[in-house]
Amino acid sequence: MEYLGYEAIIANGTSIYSSGTTGEPKLIHQTPEKLKAADEVAIDSQKLTTKSKVYTVCKMNHAGGLLAQTLPAFRLGAEIHIEQFNPYRWVKEINKYTHSHLIPAQAKAVMKTKGWRTLDLTNIWITCGSDKVDWYIINAFVKKGATFMANWGMTEIGPCAINTVFDSVDKIEEYRSKII
């Protein structure tokens, strides 16, 4: 998607499909006002800055591709790189970036690569959602050094409406003990 496309989305809004986690995928219109408010929350909750480098591997018609980090980063003037997801390439390229959003299936695919064993995700912000994020995924990414935010509801509500940030194994265990 060219930058002109982002400007049109910011000015006019856009419609995207929900992931279908709560039933059939729904086409939901995102008004310019909703996008602006959602971008502000995404910027704040994920600590996006003008110096952020976003690696987008979700499709642009998916909230994870457009709303999680890409549109907020565009608003800031941050660097954005968009490409089709390939788990081997993601492992090879992620350390060039500060932020990436994965859906759980992508996270699982990344974890199955040979490069995962030696991957260091220190100082990388991973947002993951669109479907249930299993504890073992959160734990695996945090053990690699990532700050990991699990989120849901970004199409219907906002990009970071329901989220929890994990930056240590202790925090994972503390949170799990409260809900289990």
Residue ranges and their predicted role:
Residues 2-17, 47-53:
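Conserved pre-ATP/AMP-binding loop-to-beta segment of ANL
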Residues 99-102, 111-173:
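Gly/Ser/Thr-rich phosphate-binding loop
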Residues 174-180:
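Short Gly/Pro-enriched turn/cap motifs at secondary-structure boundaries
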Residues 21, 77, 153:
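Conserved G/P- and acidic residue-centered "switch" motifs that form tight phosphate/ATP-binding loops
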Residues 23, 62, 156-159:
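Active-site proximal helix/loop that lines the substrate pocket
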Residues 26-45, 49, 53-112, 125, ...:
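AMP-binding/adenylate-forming
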Residues 12-28:
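Conserved adenylation A10 loop of the ANL superfamily
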